A protein has these predicted regions:
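A structural boundary/capping signal
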Residues: 1-170
Length: 170
């Protein structure tokens, strides 16, 4: 089965230039398809109770939900950003979910706020982040989310400065 998300990124990489092209090319380099499982398969009933209480899972709040889950279990859970297909429509949107115990991906927002079967959606992960990284980016940006975009912007600035230094040496 083809991945519509990555096909879209490939297309955007061909029609853009400069920073945008570099962004899509980097996304394609970092991208890996993943499969989510039900949170019930990973967490105990007691842990799920704590999750529902602490995370306050709501529609359109995936970044906050994933951030809170990573903070609730910092030794077990990482925050993941990428894209996922919108249930019932099949096109990708920027999204956040979690990696548990280094091997199980869970999407509390799709599973509990949207009541979707997470095993049937396409997911493309860009990177998994520990709580120190997501806290730092959230404090800097004053919002949840856009960790990948923020770190890419930092990388792009450093890369541009490095190229400028190298050109000045010539």
């Amino acid at each position: 089965m083809s991945n519509t998300i990555m096909e879209q990124w490939k297309f955007f990489a061909t029609i853009t230039d400069g920073y945008q092209r570099a962004y899509y090319e980097r996304k394609l380099k970092d991208a890996h398809e993943i499969k989510c499982v039900s949170a019930r398969d990973v967490f105990t009933p007691q842990e799920l109770e704590r999750i529902f209480l602490y995370c306050q899972i709501e529609k359109r709040m995936c970044y906050r939900t994933a951030y809170r889950l990573a903070n609730l279990f910092p030794d077990r859970v990482k925050y993941v950003e990428g894209e996922a297909t919108i249930p019932k429509f099949g096109f990708g949107v920027e999204h956040a979910w979690n990696l548990v115990d280094g091997e199980h991906y869970v999407d509390l927002t799709f599973e509990y706020a949207l009541h979707e079967d997470v095993t049937k959606e396409q997911y493309v992960a860009l990177s998994a982040y520990d709580v120190d990284t997501i806290r730092s980016v959230a404090a800097r940006n004053q919002v949840y989310g856009n960790v990948y975009g923020t770190l890419f912007a930092d990388w792009a600035k450093q890369d541009k400065a490095k190229k400028k230094r190298n050109n000045n040496k010539k």
